[in-house]
Amino acid sequence: MTINPVSRKVAWLRVVTLAIAAFIFNTTEFVPVGLLSDIAESFHMQTAQVGIMLTIYAWVVAVMSLPFMLLTSQMERRKLLICLFVLFIASHVLSFLAWNFTVLVISRIGIAFAHAIFWSITASLAIRLAPAGKRAQALSLIATGTALAMVLGLPIGRVVGQYFGWRTTFFAIGMGALITLLCLIKLLPKLPSEHSGSLKSLPLLFRRPALMSLYVLTVVVVTAHYTAYSYIEPFVQNVAGLSANFATVLLLILGGAGIIGSLVFGKLGNRHASSLVSIAIALLVVCLLLLLPAADSEAHLAILSIFWGIAIMVIGLGMQVKVLALAPDATDVAMALFSGIFNIGIGAGALVGNQVSLHWSMSAIGYIGAIPACAALVWAVLIFRKWPVTLEEQPH
């Protein structure tokens, strides 16, 4: 059976390769969380000082997502992917060679530029490349690649960094990207730009109060999560007094729990998305409040991490599904905005965690993160009452 001139097998291979690319891009965004202590030691810096790199990366993505999407809106997509992968790979080689912290930050900015473009076009590309009638499954595959970055990418990156040095982790990600690029070159046809949206789309999106409310919810809840998550590795070692190996195990547990969250959302998300997101935010509040008390034992931290991982995965999937449902006419613009806003939250959370660790105490990151998490919970309840019909049930 063929689909337009290509077989279903080839169509799925294209989507899977794009999902692998999503895995690689998200792995490199998250992996510094597991390498902060090693990077700090190699440059003779404090962990909290190195942590500012997370904020810089996230805010570069936030600021550049929409401008880059608009600048490249007419560019043929296959060529655009090749160009951004070349930048991505070259920047990872520079990370590997970085002779001081400034050079490392510059290399991360280059990666962030590629990241900004990649995530503004990925959802629409997956839909275009999918076999007929399989668009939802294609988007699910991209989400799976994203989830696996936390489940496998971050812990594996940390293990590689522990045994071979953090530079090797970045080099390995670059080589993985090179292999993926070669696959994309072989598999992808020419992909003229379609329905990418333009500046004219922005006023239309800004006049959708449900969408704007979701963006606000996204930035607040992501800030809450990353206030604590950005510094979980040094927290485990310096505050809880546990081993570096356990920090790796904890990251694996937290990421692995995301699979459970993904399954829960896949089962119940179509009918109960709003309720699931609200419950997940409430669960996040509890996890952040219990982070310091749980630091008294490995078992308590491990159990807490399971619920934390489930909560953040349900929140992330819920937000993305709702945004896509509310902006089917300007997917690229809406997702570029979502990516930018999500990264504002990552950067803000990492910055708050940085300031708390430097000027107060790293032991307080859970309590401080719980403050915006509580605000997010109140906001979620308000907006889901105002727009009670789940977005998935709206007519398309």
From Swiss-Prot:
GO terms for molecular function: carbohydrate transmembrane transporter activity. It is a multi-pass membrane protein. Involved in the efflux of sugars. The physiological role may be the reduction of the intracellular concentration of toxic sugars or sugar metabolites. The keyword Cell inner membrane applies. Belongs to the major facilitator superfamily. SotB (TC 2.A.1.2) family. Residues 36-49, 102, 157-168, 230-245, 296-300, 354-363 are periplasmic. It comes from Salmonella typhi. It comes from the Bacteria. The keyword Metal-binding does not apply. InterPro entries: MFS (IPR011701), MFS_dom (IPR020846), MFS_Efflux_Transporters (IPR050189), MFS_trans_sf (IPR036259), Sugar_effux_transptr_put (IPR023495). It is found in: Cell inner membrane. One of its GO terms (cellular component) is plasma membrane. CDD domains: MFS_NepI_like. Residues 1-14, 71-80, 124-135, 190-208, 267-274, 322-332, 385-396 are cytoplasmic. Keywords: Cell inner membrane, Cell membrane, Membrane, Sugar transport, Transmembrane, Transmembrane helix, Transport. This is Probable sugar efflux transporter. HAMAP family: MFS_SotB. The chain crosses the membrane at residues 15-35, 50-70, 81-101, 103-123, 136-156, 169-189, 209-229, 246-266, 275-295, 301-321, 333-353, 364-384. PROSITE patterns: MFS. The gene is sotB.
